[in-house]
């Protein structure tokens, strides 16, 4: 029987719990550094798989600059969006369902050289005005959205004609049990809601590096339990075992592709 998607309140509680534990974030950050080396932007406090090279590529693909405004959809702690704002000179509005994440993003934003603001909202209901943004971005969020078409439709709604939506995410043929169902094709849904595709790039080394991340995490499970406590540690360890096929024998990383996508809202081209 098909399960109903989680309610807004359930989703908020899940992500608040995810973001509130700074010890988990710090432990994962060290694992990212070990897996990615200098490519990992540790200074941004990000809790995802974004790299410096991908951030530069996203900034270029947005085609925005000073005097323009971009939305960071599912901004989390805000680090990648703030990097993009600084690199492009554009103002940024971050949207996230977690008030805990937004508070951490606001604290991180207390620095000169960027214009940023944050407000509570979901990917498919941002509360932003229509056709007012010169670009939108998202880092490793879309996989968790139950209704991806609604999320893409909301993104196209807030963008001006010709504006770009640039994001990283995963396309998957299989997902472990108790994870969101696999999503294989962003492009068809993007086109259906009014985007034209400018870039669809499979990040070829991404899942190999994610495997290294999980291997290092499992190798340090005693340290993880000591630092995070049994319950929090076992959640992270189960994630690694599940994706590597150590629970049911299916290596799900072999059925997963991390992608970088740039799509333009149909209309006049931006400079």
Question: Model-predicted segments: where are they?
Answer:
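N-terminal, positively charged/glycine-rich alpha-helical extensions of SAM-dependent methyltransferases
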Residues: 1-38
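A short acidic, Gly/Pro-enriched loop at the edge of an enzyme's catalytic core
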Residues: 124-136
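Conserved Class I S-adenosyl-L-methionine
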Residues: 203-271
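Conserved class I S-adenosyl-L-methionine
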Residues: 164-187
């Amino acid at each position: 029987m098909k399960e109903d998607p989680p309610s807004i309140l359930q989703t908020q509680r899940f992500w608040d719990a995810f973001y509130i534990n700074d010890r988990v974030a710090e432990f994962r950050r060290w694992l990212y550094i070990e897996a990615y080396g200098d490519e990992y932007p540790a200074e941004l406090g990000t809790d995802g798989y974004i790299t410096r090279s991908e951030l530069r590529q996203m900034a270029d693909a947005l085609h925005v600059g000073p005097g323009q405004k971009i939305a960071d959809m599912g901004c989390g702690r805000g680090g990648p969006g703030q990097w993009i704002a600084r690199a492009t000179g554009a103002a940024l509005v971050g949207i996230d369902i977690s008030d805990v994440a937004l508070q951490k993003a606001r604290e991180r934003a207390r620095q000169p050289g960027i214009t940023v603001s944050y407000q509570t909202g979901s990917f498919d209901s941002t509360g932003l005005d229509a056709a007012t943004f010169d670009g939108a971005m998202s880092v490793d969020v879309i996989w968790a959205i139950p209704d991806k078409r609604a999320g893409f439709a909301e993104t196209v709604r807030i963008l001006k004609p010709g504006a770009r939506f640039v994001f990283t995410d995963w396309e998957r043929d299989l997902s472990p049990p108790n994870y969101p169902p696999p999503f294989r094709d962003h492009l068809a849904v993007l086109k259906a809601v009014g985007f034209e595709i400018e870039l669809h790039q499979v990040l070829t080394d991404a899942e190999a590096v994610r495997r290294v991340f999980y291997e290092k995490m499992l190798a340090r499970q005693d340290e993880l339990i000591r630092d995070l406590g049994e319950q929090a540690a076992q959640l992270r360890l189960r994630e690694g075992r599940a994706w590597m096929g150590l629970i049911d024998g299916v290596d799900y990383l072999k059925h997963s592709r991390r992608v970088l996508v740039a799509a333009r809202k149909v209309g006049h081209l931006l400079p």
